């Protein structure tokens, strides 16, 4: 347990940040899984729709500071490549 006022505040902030990061990480994993499942099911429309949602959310997480721009672009690019392989 923290003994100083500033240490107590840092502990509170760490808890909040951890919960927020867990929420973002879970959302990203679920959205990515939705795209991959649609590709495995060979459902082009669902894959494209899921990819659009992934793209929007990844870049919104960039603006919130959860991801770096290059990281989000890399993930979206790889998922787009999967979806395009299904279309082609």
Curated annotation (Swiss-Prot):
<dbReference type="GO" id="GO:0070181">
    <property type="term" value="F:small ribosomal subunit rRNA binding"/>
</dbReference>
<dbReference type="GO" id="GO:0003735">
    <property type="term" value="F:structural constituent of ribosome"/>
</dbReference>
<protein>
    <recommendedName>
        <fullName>Small ribosomal subunit protein bS20</fullName>
    </recommendedName>
</protein>
<keyword id="KW-0687">Ribonucleoprotein</keyword>
<comment type="function">
    <text>Binds directly to 16S ribosomal RNA.</text>
</comment>
<keyword id="KW-0689">Ribosomal protein</keyword>
<feature type="region of interest" description="Disordered">
    <location>
        <begin position="1"/>
        <end position="20"/>
    </location>
</feature>
<dbReference type="InterPro" id="IPR036510">
    <property type="entry name" value="Ribosomal_bS20_sf"/>
</dbReference>
<dbReference type="GO" id="GO:0015935">
    <property type="term" value="C:small ribosomal subunit"/>
</dbReference>
<dbReference type="GO" id="GO:0006412">
    <property type="term" value="P:translation"/>
</dbReference>
<dbReference type="Pfam" id="PF01649">
    <property type="entry name" value="Ribosomal_S20p"/>
</dbReference>
<comment type="similarity">
    <text>Belongs to the bacterial ribosomal protein bS20 family.</text>
</comment>
<dbReference type="GO" id="GO:0005829">
    <property type="term" value="C:cytosol"/>
</dbReference>
<keyword id="KW-0699">rRNA-binding</keyword>
<keyword id="KW-0694">RNA-binding</keyword>
<dbReference type="InterPro" id="IPR002583">
    <property type="entry name" value="Ribosomal_bS20"/>
</dbReference>
